[in-house]
C-alpha cells in the first residue's frame, strides 16, 4: 500500500501544473481586456444606439465629447446601410457612395443640407427625420431640375420642374405627380394652364398649341372631353361638345366670314345642315 501511495503523489502534482497555466492565461486575458476597455473608454470611444421616429434605429461607434455627444465614427442604420460620420464637419459618407454635408440631429439628417448621390443626382434643401422634407432643389443627372416643396422625398405641394429640353411645369404636386392647378409649357411652344389629376390634364383648362390654335374647356384623362371652345389660328371657332379629343355632339361653328352652323356633329363632321 505504501508503494501505491508513493506512485500517486507525483501524478497529482503533475495534473496541477496545466490547470494553473490555464487559470493564469484566463486571468491574464481578462486583465488585458479590462485594460483595452479602459483605454477605449478614456480615449472617448463609445457605442450609442438611437431609436428613430419611423421605428428604426441608428447605431454609432466612435469618439464622443466629454458630454457624451458623438463627434466622429461609424454609423449603422436599421436598413443595413453603413456610413462614416464626422459631426464636427457635419458630413456623412455612406457605404453606397452617397455623401451628405449639412445639419444633423441625433446622427440623422435634419435641417439644411446637401446630398450628392452616387448616381450623380444632387439635392440641396431641407431635411426632416433623415428624409428629404420641406423646400429644396433636386438636380437630376439627366439635366432635369425640380425646385419646390417635397414631402418625405416626393414632390408634394407647389414646385417647378424643368426638363433638359426646356419644357417647364409650375404648379401643384401630390405624391410625386402633377395634381391640382398648374402651368405646363413645352419646348415646342405649346402650353397648358389648368387643372391636373394624377399627371393628366383633368378638369377645366386652356391649351395653346404650337401652331397657334387654342382650346378652352373641359379635359378628362388628358383628352378634350365635355364642353369647350376651340379657336383655329385662321379664325374659325367651335363652341360645344367634345368626346375623345374630337368634336362630337351639339355645338356651334363660326367661320371667319361670319357664317355659322349650330347643330349636331359626329367625329368632327356636320350631321344636320342648320347653317345661318
Sequence positions of predicted segments:
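Glycine/tyrosine- and acidic-biased, solvent-exposed loop/turn segments at the edges of beta-strands
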Residues: 2-276
Amino acid at each position: 500500500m505504501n508503494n501505491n501511495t508513493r506512485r500517486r503523489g507525483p501524478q497529482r502534482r503533475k495534473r496541477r501544473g496545466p490547470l494553473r497555466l490555464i487559470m493564469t492565461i484566463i486571468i491574464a486575458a481578462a486583465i488585458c481586456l479590462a485594460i483595452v476597455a479602459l483605454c477605449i473608454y478614456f480615449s472617448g470611444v463609445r457605442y450609442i444606439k438611437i431609436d428613430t421616429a419611423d421605428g428604426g434605429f441608428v447605431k454609432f461607434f466612435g469618439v464622443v465629447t466629454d458630454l457624451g455627444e458623438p463627434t466622429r465614427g461609424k454609423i449603422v442604420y436599421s436598413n443595413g446601410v453603413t456610413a462614416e460620420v464626422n459631426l464636427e464637419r457635419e458630413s456623412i459618407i455612406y457605404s453606397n457612395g452617397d455623401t451628405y454635408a449639412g445639419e444633423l440631429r441625433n446622427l440623422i439628417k435634419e435641417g439644411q443640407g446637401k446630398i450628392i448621390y452616387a448616381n450623380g443626382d444632387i439635392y440641396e434643401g431641407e431635411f426632416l427625420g433623415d428624409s428629404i422634407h420641406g423646400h429644396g432643389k433636386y438636380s437630376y443627372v439627366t439635366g432635369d431640375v425640380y425646385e419646390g416643396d417635397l414631402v418625405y422625398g416626393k414632390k408634394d405641394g407647389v414646385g417647378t420642374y424643368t426638363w433638359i429640353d426646356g419644357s417647364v411645369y409650375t404648379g401643384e404636386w401630390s405624391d410625386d405627380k402633377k395634381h391640382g392647378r398648374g402651368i405646363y409649357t413645352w419646348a415646342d411652344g405649346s402650353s397648358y394652364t389648368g387643372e391636373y389629376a394624377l399627371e393628366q390634364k383633368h378638369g377645366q383648362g386652356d391649351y395653346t398649341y404650337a401652331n397657334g390654335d387654342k382650346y378652352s374647356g373641359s379635359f378628362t384623362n388628358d383628352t378634350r372631353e365635355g364642353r369647350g371652345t376651340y379657336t383655329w389660328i385662321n379664325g374659325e371657332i367651335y363652341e360645344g361638345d367634345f368626346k375623345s379629343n374630337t368634336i362630337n355632339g351639339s355645338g356651334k361653328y363660326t367661320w371667319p366670314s361670319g357664317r355659322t352652323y349650330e347643330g349636331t356633329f359626329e367625329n368632327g363632321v356636320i350631321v344636320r345642315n342648320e347653317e345661318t
